[in-house]
Amino acid sequence: MEKPALEVQLKTLPNSPGVYQYFDKNGKILYVGKAKNLKKRVTSYFNKNHDSHRIGVMVKKICEIKHIVVASETDALLLENNLIKKHQPRFNVMLKDDKTYPWICIKNERFPRVFPTRRLIKDGSEYYGPFTSFKTVNTLLDLIKGLYKLRTCNYDLAEDKIRNGKYKVCLEYHLGNCLGPCEGFQPEEEYNNNIEAIRQIVKGNFKDSLQRFRNQMKQHSEKMEFEDAQRIKNKIDVLENYQAKSTVVNPRINNVDVFSVVSDEGYGYVNFLQLSHGAIIRSHTIEMKKKLDESDRELLELAIVEIRQRFSSNSTEIYVPFKVDVGEELKIVIPKLGDKKKIVELSQRNAKYFRQERFKQMKIVDPDRHVNRVMAQMKEDLRLGKEPRHIECFDNSNIQGTNPVAACVVFKNGKPSKKDYRKFNIKTVEGPDDFASMEEVVFRRYRRLLNEGEDLPELIIVDGGKGQLSSGVKALETLGLRGKIAIIGIAKRLEEIFYPEDSIPLYLDKKSETLKIIQQLRNEAHRFGITFHRNKRSKTALNTELESIQGIGEKTVVELLTHFRSLKRIKEASQKELADVVGSAKAAIICNFYHSE
């Protein structure tokens, strides 16, 4: 692959269903495709030799890849069709004809007909779907026809024409497939009740019909009519597996713009979905750099105006996740339920994916840019004199004062530097005293760094509130480092940030990158300290029992544990096995201790 930018786009594609679009150097769409897994499908074009010359030619022309994330593979198929018909890409052949996916139509007329169609006509008729194949449509229509007797003729069944006897029943009536509304044999109310039941079925509301089918199946089974019972069972299976509609296309939603936003400390990401005749025809996401810590609402209002101008949108209705003010001529809808809500959620998913991909691309193309941004943000958020490129965090660990230890973890440029981690046994403190323990380890840590001429951190974090912070400050003061290294404390309950000699804590935004890094430091220090403490307790328990044996010293204990790895194995070892490690005399002492009556 010749273009680094393209390689980055491939690496950051999501493992999700969706539609991808290939563009040439002039920004013209070359190809639109669907995928169950975008990353696998798109990457496959660039990872193998192609039997088709056409594909090879197309791949050489690709300069940019865009994609739209959807909820399912079916949605991807439908959206692919919409985009191909909209843009007519050069390399698309299979779906470039004038065919479209089928719908089920309930005609706007007296005694409505129910039939499949590829055309959506604005005459007040109801359309349900779309379906990915006529096989699915016909299966459902066969089911409906088996349940309800509907007319198939195209007569105008006006009341006066029926009353005047203009029509005669046809063969369908004599075959039992129609109840003869054309001659007035079926009341209009009864027919309309059947149509309402059909509406519920094609919309996916099957509860009543399923219950009726189950009752029928039970009755057939009780009468030993097993073939009829199986026929009803097949209908139940069809209903249960049928999905009435797609989150991508809905004919009742027409000429609408959909907007959503996600943001972090520095940037906002606004996604735009354009719907025409109930189908998504465009998805576009923009990145907006915050200047004055703008809210999501402010970002969305700015973006809506910009995007509508850019794409010359004439929609008079927009869907958004919350209230915005963008002009009186627009109808603002904040969906709470149903299809409209699902479309807004789809827009939000695309905005989130775009944001994730931007971060991944940034780290691949310019890793320093991301680090620099985070460091600058931490300096500003924490009111520091310089960027905290080197941060150290301390945590104490003990249980009722037993085996007191402490841990120091080190982050450099926002990432753990595990080779610099340090653990401490508390030496000068008796009993459970977190404050004195914190003072000891901070003092020992930086006395050593000073003595060895090592670099000092720009920021120290102590896990705890005002008391632990005061202890850390006292240690720095003793070393003459107070004011030379910034030090803060973080209290767990409310994630409060404490500063020396400041009784009012700082509360960072929960979405803040700064808070996330501080929490990561605190959690890592806690994990490292707990692991050390647990290991020390286990070792102490082993050593205490072995060293209590008269004639067995520390050196012998170490030899035994190194060889046998556990106290249980030492107890189970034979005298000969023990003698091979520590000699026959000590082996006899150990065996006598564990195996004497």
From Swiss-Prot:
Transmembrane segments: none annotated. It comes from Christiangramia forsetii (strain DSM 17595 / CGMCC 1.15422 / KT0803). It is found in: Cytoplasm. The gene is uvrC. GO terms for molecular function: DNA binding; excinuclease ABC activity. One of its GO terms (cellular component) is cytoplasm. This is UvrABC system protein C. One of its GO terms (biological process) is nucleotide-excision repair. Belongs to the UvrC family. SMART domains: GIYc (SM00465). The UvrABC repair system catalyzes the recognition and processing of DNA lesions. UvrC both incises the 5' and 3' sides of the lesion. The N-terminal half is responsible for the 3' incision and the C-terminal half is responsible for the 5' incision. Residues 15-93 form the GIY-YIG domain. Keywords: Cytoplasm, DNA damage, DNA excision, DNA repair, Excision nuclease, SOS response. PANTHER family: UVRABC SYSTEM PROTEIN C (PTHR30562:SF1), UVRC/OXIDOREDUCTASE (PTHR30562). Residues 207-242 form the UVR domain. The keyword DNA repair applies. Interacts with UvrB in an incision complex.
